[in-house]
Amino acid sequence: MISRYGIFCRVVEQGSFTRAAEELGYSQSAVSQNVRALEQETGVTLLSRRKDGVQLTQDGQEFYPYIQSIFQAEQALE
């Protein structure tokens, strides 16, 4: 099972909650809930949600490399 860090990375890579959900085999709402939980955990809005997809906010751009590192470390431990 992929962590919320991995889910967030997939959303950023795909530029869309829907495409990330399809890739992961999750519902769009499950992906969205995981990203919201990560935003609550960090205390900042990480993504700008628009009709044409998502984009990292300024805070998201600052946090993204750290979130990627955490996800990569998790993968290495598996």
Language-model region placement:
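Short helix-boundary/capping micro-motifs
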Residues: 10-25
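Alpha-helical residues within the helix-turn-helix
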Residues: 22, 33, 40
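Alpha-helical linker/hinge and terminal dimerization helices associated
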Residues: 41-42, 63-78
